[in-house]
């Protein structure tokens, strides 16, 4: 008997997605004007930054999630769908918040750039649930997470007085814990043995898919300095670019060597390479602009690589079922992001020449408060989103259909009745 799930998706997805896109188009028509500023060298520089960010988001994160043997098509295509939807929603959210809160923000190429960076937490968190939800559920998740991260950006800017650069770096941590919380809640509704048996065979890696995932890793590795320096200028931008490359280089070497060391026969695990080589770039994202000597960023890359390998290898058996961390976002983005945020705080305290006790206390409260707020928002809104996605109206796939492209895609060479 054929599966009834594709029929429910046929009824639900076009109606929901097209209505949402029509609403977005009408809102853009009446409220979002084109930028009329003259095109100059600054426009082209902004476009180059936007191009690099889009390559990272579309190709890097898309292929990074394609390592599952029977879920590679969905990982790449759903990632692009979420990126396109998230950028539109974030631009509208920023515009209306600017109108209500009287922010002096112009809708130009920089707006698309910031919207793209604000959508990266969505792509990070999606790594924890891809293969377990359908496209309608992902649409709801994009909207919920975009609004939650918009609230974080507002609170960090107005309450904690954080710069836009640091706010975006907190997005790595927010996205990681948001996705982990959503995945944890969705897993609660499944019988333990049923969920494990359904996922064991499909989570296994295949050589071809691993190569595509490695391609995504390479895109992210090459272009990661773009995200760490996109919102900076002058000396800070230069420092961020240099230090990101140093940290990425060290984390790549650390990931390869430690992966071999952790195997009884000295063999390298491709999963470790997919994730751990990026940990240095995540860790140096916040403090990179303050680091004036390369050895500090290299040490950060080393520590981040060690943390990532440790997270992938040592506690995996006891934590994986609890955190639902099959994609590794916890030890690729979550833990290195926390390391980077704490390092930024320490460097700011050390590099300030005339720091008083009151200033140190103020900085401690604001930085720890902003970071804690991002983590708490990720968990709370992730829990709410998980509750919402578990409602039966979304026609979620059965556990037997997890990590299976045949649930969503047409395969002409297969039997028609699937």
Swiss-Prot record:
InterPro entries from the UniProt entry: Ammonium/urea_transptr, NH4_transpt_AmtB-like_dom, RhesusRHD
SUPFAM superfamilies in the cross-refs: Ammonium transporter
One Pfam family it belongs to: Ammonium_transp
GO cellular component, one term: plasma membrane
Membrane topology: Multi-pass membrane protein
Single Gene Ontology MF annotation: ammonium channel activity
Protein name: Blood group Rh(D) polypeptide
Name of the encoding gene: Rhd
């Amino acid at each position: 008997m054929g599966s009834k799930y594709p029929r429910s998706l046929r009824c639900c997805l076009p109606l929901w997605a097209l209505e949402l896109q029509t609403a977005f188009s009408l809102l853009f028509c009446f409220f979002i004007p084109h930028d009329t500023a003259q095109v100059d060298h600054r426009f082209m520089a902004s476009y180059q930054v936007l191009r690099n960010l889009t390559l990272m988001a579309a190709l890097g994160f898309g292929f990074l999630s394609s390592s599952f043997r029977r879920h590679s098509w969905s990982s790449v295509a759903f990632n692009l769908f979420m990126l396109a939807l998230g950028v539109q929603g974030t631009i509208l959210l920023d515009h209306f918040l600017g109108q209500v809160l009287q922010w002096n923000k112009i809708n130009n190429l920089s707006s698309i750039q910031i919207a793209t960076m604000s959508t990266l937490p969505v792509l990070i968190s999606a790594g924890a649930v891809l293969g377990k939800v359908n496209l309608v559920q992902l649409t709801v998740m994009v909207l919920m997470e975009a609004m939650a991260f918009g609230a974080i950006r507002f609170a960090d800017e107005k309450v904690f007085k954080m710069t836009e650069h640091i706010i975006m770096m907190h997005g790595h941590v927010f996205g990681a814990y948001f996705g982990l919380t959503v995945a944890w809640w969705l897993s609660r509704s499944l019988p333990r043995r049923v969920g494990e048996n359904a996922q064991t065979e499909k989570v296994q890696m295949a050589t071809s898919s691993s190569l595509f995932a490695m391609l995504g890793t390479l895109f992210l590795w090459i272009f990661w300095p773009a995200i760490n320096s996109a919102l900076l200028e002058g000396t800070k931008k230069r420092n961020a670019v240099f230090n990101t490359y140093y940290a990425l280089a060290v984390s790549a070497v650390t990931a390869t060597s430690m992966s071999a060391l952790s195997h009884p026969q000295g063999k390298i695990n491709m999963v470790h390479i997919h994730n751990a080589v990026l940990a240095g770039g995540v860790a140096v994202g916040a403090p990179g602009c303050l680091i004036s000597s390369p050895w500090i960023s290299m040490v950060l890359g080393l520590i981040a690589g060690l943390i990532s390998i440790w997270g992938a290898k040592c506690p995996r058996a006891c934590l994986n079922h609890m955190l639902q961390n099959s994609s590794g976002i916890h030890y690729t983005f979550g833990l290195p992001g926390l390391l980077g945020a704490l390092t930024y705080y320490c460097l700011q305290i050390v590099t300030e020449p005339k720091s008083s006790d009151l200033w140190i206390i103020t900085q401690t409260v604001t930085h720890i408060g902003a970071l804690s707020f991002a983590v708490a928002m990720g968990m709370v809104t992730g829990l709410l989103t998980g509750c919402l996605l578990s409602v039966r109206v979304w026609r979620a796939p059965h556990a037997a259909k997890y990590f299976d492209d045949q649930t969503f895609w047409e395969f002409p060479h297969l039997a028609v009745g699937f």
